[in-house]
């Protein structure tokens, strides 16, 4: 992992057009970030809605085991926030697992993908597009899978969490 930081320092406000870096300084969404700190937790202003997209660009670590990108309903630890979608890249099995966790209960895990898109020590671009019935997930511009909503109040999905063996270079 690239490092860690206290929870209060790691919160970054995601806006439709503006971001704050991990030091709280405002920057434009199209500005290249010099490696944001992992684990990362950021607020998605206004939550998700059909047509809204979350972009994560980064570089996989040289010897990765796994990394995860989650969209959650807040950042509470106790009780844990509901997880609308968790994408977990597992390098030993070359799997991209998807699941949710609502009121402490994990849903049915999904794993079918046409190919494993992540390569150690290489950059990647993940786009999570919110549509009315589902999240549509693209990696490096290719649609990889759909994940149907298990949380129906999309605006409650207002937090992104990223952890594991990667470096974040840009969020939007």
Curated annotation (Swiss-Prot):
Keywords: Acetylation, Lectin, Phosphoprotein
A UniProt-annotated Pfam family: Gal-bind_lectin
InterPro entries per the UniProt record, alphabetical: ConA-like_dom_sf, Galectin-like, Galectin_CRD
Domain Galectin as annotated: residue spans: 39-168
Gene Ontology CC terms: collagen-containing extracellular matrix
Modified residues (N-acetylalanine): 2
GO molecular function: carbohydrate binding
SMART domains: Gal-bind_lectin (SM00908), GLECT (SM00276)
Sequence positions bearing Phosphoserine: 22, 25
Subunit comment: Monomer.
Stated role: Does not bind lactose, and may not bind carbohydrates.
Name this polypeptide is given: Galectin-related protein
Organism: Mus musculus
Upper classification of the organism: Eukaryota, Metazoa, Chordata, Craniata, Vertebrata
């Amino acid at each position: 992992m690239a490092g860690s930081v206290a929870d209060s320092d790691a919160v970054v406000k995601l806006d439709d057009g503006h971001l704050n870096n991990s030091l709280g300084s405002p920057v434009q969404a199209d500005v290249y970030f010099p490696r944001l700190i992992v684990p990362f937790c950021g607020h998605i202003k206004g939550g998700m809605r059909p047509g809204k997209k979350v972009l994560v660009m980064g570089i996989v670590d040289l010897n990765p085991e796994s990394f995860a990108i989650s969209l959650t309903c807040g950042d509470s630890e106790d009780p844990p926030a509901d997880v609308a979608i968790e994408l977990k890249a597992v390098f030993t099995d070359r799997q991209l697992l998807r699941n949710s966790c609502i009121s402490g209960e994990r849903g049915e895990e999904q794993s079918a993908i046409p190919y494993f898109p992540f390569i150690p020590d290489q950059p990647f671009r993940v786009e999570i597009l919110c549509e009315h019935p589902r999240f549509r997930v693209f990696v490096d511009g290719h649609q990889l899978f759909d994940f149907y909503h298990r949380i129906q109040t999309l605006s409650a999905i207002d937090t992104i969490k990223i952890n594991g063996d990667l470096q974040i270079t840009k969020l939007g």
